[in-house]
């Protein structure tokens, strides 16, 4: 019995020794083996494969550092090449631009400029003024200064002939918050000065070129009117012939003849030979601008003596100056074209009235004149008047002598007002033109002088206020 127990102990000891000599596999290994033998769902297998792939593709930190160092070397070489290229081209770049370029070069993701350098369509102007990217630019790329903006606004106002352009521009700037109210007021003064300088400059440049531009169309129109309009003299001759052939209606032809003689007497100085006077103009005498002033031209023709030579030249100079002056004022909008035409028409008409006044003629149109019955008598009367006028002017050496104007004899009106203003203008020109020429006139003194004269005429009732304002506006625009 004891031997059986001993044998059981020996067997138990051997079994325990065998277990210690051959250890069993660890738990995780046994679990892995079981995972290999078990069949997993397809979705789980795909997810495990993806996780393993991501784990294997992840770069190690040493490799990342090596890549960054290579990128920095390439960026540095590119920066050196770009700087050498810019130094060869001598392109001015500000310090702030260099700082930005340096910051951009260190970033490997910012390589746009390098690509642009190889673009043949780029001329480098995009980066020339990087220090002020939001400034206004001209067409050549240069920054637009405040003076340039003022000049451009003035040019726009002058081209469109509309001062509302400035209001529209300023209102937009104010709405956008680009300028303040005080800056808008300053801008208004600067634009006004620039506009005035522009008008003055263009007036000086175009005054000579505009002397023979404004009237050719009117000349052709007036010539056509003269051809289409029957002459009063020819109508009167036809009526004389009809009167000789028809005595039965003697009373009616006599009344018509009386009216024709009245019209002829009124027009003997102003309109009978307008076309003939215009045809008599010689291009060599330099009086083409005076072709629409028949009365004045006839006056010059009468001053053909040697003694009246100086008087003739003075009158021509004054008349041409006034014509150019009116044309310039019409061109730049100081007066309307209608006012300019009225000014010139009244000027020629008042020359005739003043001449008749000097000759002792009545200023009012003749309403009752006995019929002459012959056109030849009208020619004789015209020649007689011309001869008397020549003798009268031989004794007149000063064209600015105080004479009684139409405004002092007849009722005041625009014609008399303009003539009186012109007479004062001539007096001033005579007084200030003793040693210099017409380019040496002090126009500011002339403007002040005319303002005083116009105010005195308004106070005396010679001028209406609106007429005085027109004259002031003419001289104030100089």
UniProtKB/Swiss-Prot annotation:
Question: What are the cysteine partners in each disulfide bond?
Answer: none
Instruction: Tell me the compartments it is located in.
Output: Cytoplasmic vesicle, Secretory vesicle lumen; Cytoplasmic vesicle, Secretory vesicle membrane; Secreted
> Would I find Signal among this entry's keywords?
yes
Protein topology in the membrane: Peripheral membrane protein
Its predominant location is cytoplasm
Give me the gene this protein comes from: scg3
Which residue ranges have biased composition labelled Basic and acidic residues?
A: 28-42, 97-120
Q: Which keywords annotate this record? A: Cleavage on pair of basic residues, Cytoplasmic vesicle, Membrane, Secreted, Signal
Q: For this UniProt entry, which residues form the secretion signal?
A: 1-21
One Gene Ontology cellular component annotation?
secretory granule membrane
Q: Which PANTHER family match?
A: SECRETOGRANIN III (PTHR17388), SECRETOGRANIN-3 (PTHR17388:SF2)
Under InterPro entries, the record lists: SCG3
Which GO biological process categories is it annotated with? protein localization to secretory granule
Task: Tell me where on the tree of life, at the top rank, the source sits.
Answer: Eukaryota
**Name used for this protein in its record:** Secretogranin-3
Lineage of this protein's species?
Eukaryota, Metazoa, Chordata, Craniata, Vertebrata
Region annotated Disordered, chain positions: 22-126, 208-287
